[in-house]
Structure formats: structure tokens, C-alpha cells
Amino acid sequence: LIGFIWDDSFRPGHRHAGIDIFSGTEAGVTPVIAAYPGYLTREADWKSTVIIRLPQDPLQLNRQIWIYYTHMADFQGNSFISPQFPAGTEEIYVEAGTLLGYQGNYSGDPANPVGVHLHISVVRDDGFGKVKNELEIENTYDPSPYFGLPLNAYENTDTIPVCN
């Protein structure tokens, strides 16, 4: 089930920088799989997030992009990321189809968990080999085309977005 999509405004002053994919299961059950081959990093303080660098954007080969996968921990921050990617992992090559972890409901605040889902973003490179800030919509691309999700949000503004 697709929840919020790229560029949704679900609270004042905020535009959603990715796609939320809900599974309808409990936290720690639904696998999260790498969509493309690339170089995985998990920062030392990331409990629920990995990012994969794609040296060649599959939709525009002359640029590098980063795919950001998050909410892979329970509401208290206990990670569901695969043990092969411990905190502090940098630039580990992964194939498409690699198990990254499992969907969770971690929000960063144990008193306010989110629903169990995967948030996935496609983030711009800064031109010097570093990822831009994923929280700023202008630093991201609409992820829909990268994952074969031709969502109908802009054509049907009065209905719930669904895949065509």
C-alpha cells in the first residue's frame, strides 16, 4: 500500500521527499530489498537507515544518485537492518535484491512512533560525490519512475493515489 508520495504536503511547511510503502504487517516482518546495485553506507548513528550510492542514475546515466531507505527499526530504535551492515558501514557493494533489513516504525521519538512502513527517497548528488540533505524536497527526485510506480496523484487530485 502506497502512503504519502513525493511532494505530498501532509503538514504545513513540509513537502514529502519520498514514497512511503506500507505492508500491513507488524514491525520487523516485511523485508526491505535493494532495488539497484550500488555502494551501501550506514552512518555510525543511523538506527533505521541505509543509503545506497548509484554511480550512474539508471534514468539519466550522466549523473550519480543516492537511494535512501529508512524506518528499519522498532519504535524504540532497535534496528531491523541486516547484521551484515552494522552502524559505521561505508561504501559496501551490494547487488540488487540484497536483503537490507525489515520495515519498522521508528520515528526518532519513542513516544511518537510512525506506522510500520518503508520510506524511500532518491537523493541528488552535490556534484562532488556527496549526498545532499534528503529532508529538503529540492534535493530529491520523484522516486516513482525508479520503482515502476506510475502513481496517479497529479491526475486524480480528489482520490487516493494508487499505482496504474
Regions found by a protein language model. Give the residues of each.
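Small beta-barrel nucleic-acid-binding modules, principally OB-folds
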Residues: 11-25, 56-70, 82-84, 124-134, ...
